[in-house]
């Protein structure tokens, strides 16, 4: 039986990082994102600089203002966060259809079928993090392990912008030294109850037998017993079947130079072709999307009689679509190429070079 390989990707202080990206003056500042009303609002995300003052998510804004009176308070822009999240989820699904989103900024990916002797899971995780940064200019942390529980635990161990692998050779040591409050799923109330029963670390939890944990914590006790041993049989539950594969890029400055834009379309066509090959799919529609300097999004699609998957075929159609869309007087800030109406293609063995 093939050993499972699960990645948990968690964006670093997601909402705050988006705000810093869109307003560079906020970089390095204590940024608190949340509700507009100071007296009723709640903190959605705090940058690491704000966390140094004790500010954290789900904290009332009134308390955040007391802890960090000179912080930079930004009203949440959920439409923007959803758009960026969509870009990130599209990247995940370009690697595997087994993606289980947990929120706008985190997901589990089962990449067992992609792992090869020359392509370890950690390398794939770094390629995903690279792609996220190229598309969104945001950093993500990743955890890699043989089950979901350990992958999630690992993703939080080397933040921000880090990668941690938990495997059979280090899992016991990591779990035994872990503060009980750092176990995924153990909140303040659970931590307090565990302290009442002298459970402060993973080692303390490990030393309790299963029947005692069930007596103390009910049905949840069995899960705690398993967590102390790094056991988790839960599968990654794919939320939907992928219908398209695409890639998009935001230019560092607004562009209306055809040569620059067409080079980028060629690059995106190649990336899209690579991802189609990785999942052994081809498609019968091609879409080009443009976002103008005024943040207006326009797109054009072409349906095909026969499915395609090569860089040349994708580029030739994308080139035509771009020429139909472009306005020489209007600079653009983003360009995207997507292939849809996917169907199974011929099998292609993967190597590390398919991901570079």
Curated annotation (Swiss-Prot):
It holds the Pfam family IMS_C. It is an enzyme of class 2 (transferase). InterPro entries: DNA/RNA_pol_sf (IPR043502), DNA_pol_Y-fam_lit_finger_sf (IPR036775), DNA_pol_Y-fam_little_finger (IPR017961), DNA_polymerase-Y (IPR050116), DNApol_IV (IPR022880), IMS_HHH_1 (IPR053848), Rev_trsase/Diguanyl_cyclase (IPR043128), UmuC (IPR001126). GO terms for molecular function: damaged DNA binding; DNA-directed DNA polymerase activity; magnesium ion binding. The active site is at 106. One of its GO terms (cellular component) is cytosol. Its cofactor is Mg(2+). The keyword RNA-binding does not apply. It comes from the Bacteria. It catalyses: DNA(n) + a 2'-deoxyribonucleoside 5'-triphosphate = DNA(n+1) + diphosphate. Poorly processive, error-prone DNA polymerase involved in untargeted mutagenesis. Copies undamaged DNA at stalled replication forks, which arise in vivo from mismatched or misaligned primer ends. These misaligned primers can be extended by PolIV. Exhibits no 3'-5' exonuclease (proofreading) activity. May be involved in translesional synthesis, in conjunction with the beta clamp from PolIII. Belongs to the DNA polymerase type-Y family. This is DNA polymerase IV. It comes from Staphylococcus epidermidis (strain ATCC 35984 / DSM 28319 / BCRC 17069 / CCUG 31568 / BM 3577 / RP62A). The gene is dinB.
